[in-house]
Swiss-Prot record:
Upper taxonomic lineage: Eukaryota, Metazoa, Chordata, Craniata, Vertebrata
Tissue expression: Detected in brain (at protein level). Mainly expressed in brain. Also expressed in kidney. Not expressed in developing or adult lung.
Keywords, ordered alphabetically: Apoptosis, Cell membrane, Cell projection, Developmental protein, Disulfide bond, Glycoprotein, Immunoglobulin domain, Membrane, Phosphoprotein, Receptor, Repeat, Signal, Synapse, Synaptosome, Transmembrane, Transmembrane helix
Residue ranges that the UniProt entry lists as topological domain Extracellular: 41-380
Post-translational modification summary for this protein: Proteolytically cleaved by caspases during apoptosis. The cleavage does not take place when the receptor is associated with netrin ligand. Its cleavage by caspases is required to induce apoptosis. Phosphorylated on different cytoplasmic tyrosine residues. Phosphorylation of Tyr-568 leads to an interaction with PTPN11 phosphatase, suggesting that its activity is regulated by phosphorylation/dephosphorylation. Tyrosine phosphorylation is netrin-dependent.
GN (gene name): Unc5c
Positions of the Ig-like C2-type domain: 161-256
Annotated ranges, domain TSP type-1: 260-314, 316-368
Main location: membrane
Chain ranges passing through the membrane: 381-401
MF (Gene Ontology): netrin receptor activity; netrin receptor activity involved in chemorepulsion; protein kinase binding; tubulin binding
Residues covered by region (Required for netrin-mediated axon repulsion of neuronal growth cones): 402-931
Annotated positions of the Phosphoserine modification: 502
Name of the protein in question: Netrin receptor UNC5C
Record's subunit section: Interacts with DCC (via cytoplasmic domain). Interacts (tyrosine phosphorylated form) with PTPN11. Interacts (via extracellular domain) with FLRT3 (via extracellular domain). Interacts (via Ig-like C2-type domain) with DSCAM (via extracellular domain). Interacts (via death domain) with DAPK1. Interacts (via cytoplasmic domain) with TUBB3; this interaction is decreased by NTN1/Netrin-1.
Length: 931
């Protein structure tokens, strides 16, 4: 009997003690109520049972081995839902909160050989009629509930839907005719269906695989992009949508890639068609470079050009009449001549035939012959000997003079070399022997430059209007020359020393120093206020340069999992780091580097810079430039002219631009005015000395680009110089109208002060401001007080562009002889945080962000997806950039984070999602601080 109980317990998955409590104890109660005889009969049975039962370990909750999965009813075919759990005494299905009848369950039960626990598997069948009979907003769903002695466990919900696929596409592709290498976009929105249809594209009935042909790209919302149209891309394209129910094809869109014809080069001019007189010449070209294809336009213009020509007629030469016979000569002949000039041959005409000279005997053969005289021969021999002797004497004298001069020349060279310490030989007199402190080493010498190099500007380039300089004078250039023996030339000023050195040597020194400055590592900035460093992993973070408007957002997931990068962002203030500017171009942002260069990124980082361009982009052509490894500046993208191949995206806000890039490099934003209405913002800041013990008092008016970093640099400079801010800085719109900036001072109390300005105003040339290449550009007004007792200064400063806008500053300051503390309120001392890492760097919590991406990345039939989010956030200028990313919503939210850093306006984001019909309550809770 005990064996039977154990077998029953094993089959049911129950412990022996539990089974005995359930079966034996009630039997004992019944037996005790019967007679004693019956009790005596069963004594043997109870004597066989132990007095106490061992306690089995507690049974675990049921664990689902198989949970029901979502299913689709195709046509009228029912679907089966399966569920398996262990240990489980019972499993039932609950559909739409109602229990499914026991008879509708198909149960399979077995014992796991390893654990000895009961494994129960249940299935039910769902018909189309059951699903259609459900009323309400929620889809038909079912879930399993499993029991054991320890309790119950519920499975996940499995939704059962009726599968279908509409016949009509919501948007079908349209045929296009495009030129060669143009980007092509074919749009397709598949029919509504459950489950959502998968989309593929056919090219002439062949499936397009973007992996095999990288010229094709299929976006996340099913559009087909041909990056650069080729002749082979001329074809019929079809959008195919399919799911488990059906397969639909859109109408065919024909893409024709045409080639406009181009002229070949002109052939050579033909010869004039007239051999005598007026005619014409012609040259031809053909429309074959390239020839028009697929309906491309034929070449415009003429294929033949003709010009008039005149060919001079040939003139044959004719003889003039014979001249008279000459007198009879010693040889008893006389002659006569004629010329071929009546007319002379011209333009290819024939020359005259015959003799030019004609001679004949003039004595009729009676001429006398004389023998040569011996005296004449002796005379000729004497002359030859005399000439030979003279030539020999001349050669000897010349050789002697040459050797003497050659020895003197070598001596001069040695002396010159000694004076110059091994430099190029120059002619220096003996009176200048005091130039060297010790005798130089003539065997080895070298030149070394010590000290800073400054650009040499002509005085005529400055603003010639007052004795108060607009720009502070540059320090003198000092150069030392060292030789191998340690002798040093005295420190002369630039003009004197340049006269001793050759121009080539001076230029070489300057160029070498500039090259050394250029090759310095970008990450080793000496000024920590211009650089931010940080260590980041896949959680991302933020790098901020305080008070500069420059930051770098590293989104979560941008750095590959398992990698750690030492990243930096730095502002370059040296002029040799700025890109070259053309006439109408201007620098709109500081030059900023981010690194490390070449780092592998899996999604774009966002570099934020303050810019000084007026928001009206129609007057601007704004382009992003980056500096290559060789130091050359290259164009990256023009705002408004992006295409599929552009590596960066620029979001231009009113005061900042956000650069989305996967390439860490050196960047700058350059603007080119397309109209004279284009304007850039200037920041006008006025400074004066913190203390003044003399009669003169200088006021400096800075005209800066309206960026935080430009003002920060001037504030730091003035703090070092002991200056103070006299008035709150003001902005000025400076138009590209080629008009100068005019500065003037008014309403001075003449009984206390007098201006040393000779003219009524000062002007800064237009191009000095517009190019943006001159840092810390300022103008100085020097006032003189008539007495040291005068401590109050009241005046007005007017700064305006000629025929443009202006600003007026009302100054009312106290002149102190004792220095006081420098107060620069525009530099926020609390802004010392440069690095924020991990989730704390972002406003949107990571779980909420993941939910938003999963719900908005997939295209929706009503458009309530990432495209509408971009439109609501005003980030929809070029949606194709986001469409090429694996998670468009994630990139849009990254850009929103960069725009709203550091505050983060989550309530605004929640309101946008509410307008889209996305009731993201978690975002609302986070906006209210309840997350």
């Amino acid at each position: 009997m005990r064996k039977g109980l154990r077998a029953t317990a094993a089959r049911c998955g129950l412990g022996l003690g539990y089974l005995l409590q359930m079966l034996v104890l009630p039997a004992l109660a019944l037996l005790s109520a019967s007679g004693t005889g019956s009790a005596a009969q069963d004594d043997d049975f109870f004597h066989e049972l132990p007095e106490t039962f061992p306690s089995d370990p507690p049974e675990p909750l049921p664990h689902f081995l198989i949970e029901p999965e979502e299913a689709y009813i195709v046509k009228n075919k029912p679907v089966n839902l399966y569920c398996k759990a262990s240990p489980a005494t019972q499993i039932y299905f609950k559909c739409n909160s109602e229990w499914v009848h026991q008879k509708d369950h198909v149960v399979d039960e077995r014992v796991d050989e390893t654990s000895g626990l009961i494994v129960r598997e249940v299935s039910i069948e769902i018909s189309r009629q059951q699903v259609e009979e459900l009323f309400g907003p929620e889809d038909y769903w079912c879930q399993c509930v499993a029991w054991s002695s320890a309790g119950t466990t519920k499975s996940r919900k499995a939704y059962v839907r009726i599968a279908y696929l509409r016949k009509t596409f919501e948007q079908e592709p349209l045929g296009k005719e495009v030129s060669l290498e143009q980007e092509v976009l074919l749009q397709c929105r598949p029919p509504e269906g459950i489950p959502m249809a998968e989309v593929e594209w056919l090219k002439n009935e062949d499936i397009i695989d973007p992996v095999e042909d990288r010229n094709f790209y299929i976006t996340i919302d099913h559009n087909l992009i041909i990056k650069q149209a080729r002749l082979s891309d001329t074809a019929n394209y079809t959008c195919v949508a399919k799911n488990i129910v059906a397969k639909r094809k859109s109408t065919t869109a024909t893409v024709i890639v045409y080639v406009n014809g181009g002229w070949s080069t002109w052939a050579e001019w033909s010869v004039c068609n007239s051999r005598c007189g007026r005619g014409y010449q012609k040259r031809t070209r053909t429309c074959t470079n390239p020839a028009p294809l697929n309906g491309g336009a034929f070449c415009e213009g003429q294929s033949v050009q003709k010009i008039a020509c005149t060919t001079l007629c040939p003139v044959d030469g004719r003889w003039t009449s014979w001249s008279k016979w000459s007198t009879c000569g010693t040889e008893c002949t006389h002659w006569r001549r004629r010329e071929c000039t009546a007319p002379a041959p011209k333009n290819g005409g024939k020359d005259c035939d015959g003799l030019v000279l004609q001679s004949k005997n003039c004595t009729d053969g009676l001429c006398m012959q004389a023998a040569p005289d011996s005296d004449d021969v002796a005379l000729y021999v004497g002359i030859v000997i005399a000439v030979t002797v003279c030539l020999a004497i001349t050669v000897v004298v010349a050789l002697f003079v040459y050797r003497k001069n050659h020895r003197d020349f070598e001596s001069n060279i040695i002396d010159s070399s000694a004076l110059n310490g091994g430099f190029q030989p120059v002619n220096i007199k003996a009176a200048r022997q005091d130039l060297l402190a010790v005798p130089p080493d003539l065997t080895s010498a070298a030149a070394m430059y010590r000290g800073p190099v400054y650009a040499l500007h002509d005085v005529s380039d400055k603003i010639p209007m007052t004795n108060s300089p607009i720009l502070d004078p540059l320090p003198n250039l000092k150069i030392k020359v060292y030789n191998s023996s340690g002798a040093v030339t005295p420190q002369d000023d630039l003009a004197e020393f340049s006269s001793k050195l050759s121009p080539q040597m001076t230029q070489s020194l300057l160029e070498n120093e500039a090259l050394n400055l250029k090759n310095q590592s970008l990450a080793r900035q000496t000024d920590p206020s211009c650089t931010a460093f940080g260590t980041f992993n896949s959680l991302g973070g933020h790098l901020i340069i305080p008070n500069s408007g420059v930051s770098l957002l590293i989104p979560a997931g941008a750095i590959p999992q398992g990698r750690v990068y030492e990243m930096y962002v730095t502002v370059h203030r040296k002029e040799n780091m700025r890109p070259p500017m053309e006439d109408s171009q201007t620098l709109l942002t500081p030059v900023v580097s981010c690194g490390p260069p070449g780092a592998l990124l899996t999604r774009p980082v966002i570099l934020t810079l303050h810019h000084c361009a007026d928001p009206n982009t129609e007057d601007w052509k704004i382009q992003l430039k980056n500096q290559a490894v060789q130091g050359q500046w290259e164009d990256v993208v023009v705002v408004g002219e992006e295409n599929f191949t552009t590596p960066c995206y620029i979001q231009l806000d009113a005061e900042a631009c956000h650069i989305l890039t996967e390439n860490l490099s050196t960047y700058a934003l350059v603007g080119q005015s397309t109209t004279k209405a284009a304007a850039k913002r200037l920041k006008l800041a006025i400074f004066g000395p913190l203390c003044c013990s003399s009669l003169e008092y200088s006021i400096r008016v800075y005209c800066l680009d309206d960026t935080q970093d430009a003002l920060k640099e001037v504030l730091q400079l003035e703090r070092q110089m002991g200056g103070q801010l006299l008035e709150e800085p003001k902005a000025l719109h400076f138009k590209g109208s080629i008009h100068n900036l005019r500065l003037s001072i008014h309403d001075i109390t003449h009984s206390l002060w007098k201006s040393k300005l000779l003219a009524k105003y000062q002007e800064i040339p237009f191009y000095h401001i517009w190019s943006g290449s001159q840092r810390n550009l300022h103008c100085t007004f020097t006032l003189e007080r008539l007495s040291l007792n005068t401590v109050e200064l009241v005046c007005k400063l007017c700064v305006r562009q000629v025929e443009g806008e202006g600003q007026i500053f009302q100054l009312n300051c106290t002149v102190s002889e004792e220095p006081t503390g420098i107060d620069l309120p525009l530099l926020d001392p609390a802004s010392t945080i440069t690095t924020v890492t991990g989730p704390s760097a972002f406003s949107i919590p990571l779980p909420i962000r993941q939910k938003l991406c999963s719900s908005l990345d997939a295209p929706q039939t009503r458009g309530h997806d990432w495209r509408m989010l971009a439109h609501k956030l005003n980030l929809d200028r070029y949606l194709n950039y986001f469409a090429t990313k694996s998670s468009p919503t994630g990139v849009i939210l990254d850009l929103w984070e960069a725009q709203n850093f550091p505050d983060g306006n989550l309530s605004m984001l929640a309101a946008v999602l509410e307008e889209m019909g996305r009731h993201e309550t978690v975002v609302s809770l986070a906006a209210e601080g309840q997350y």
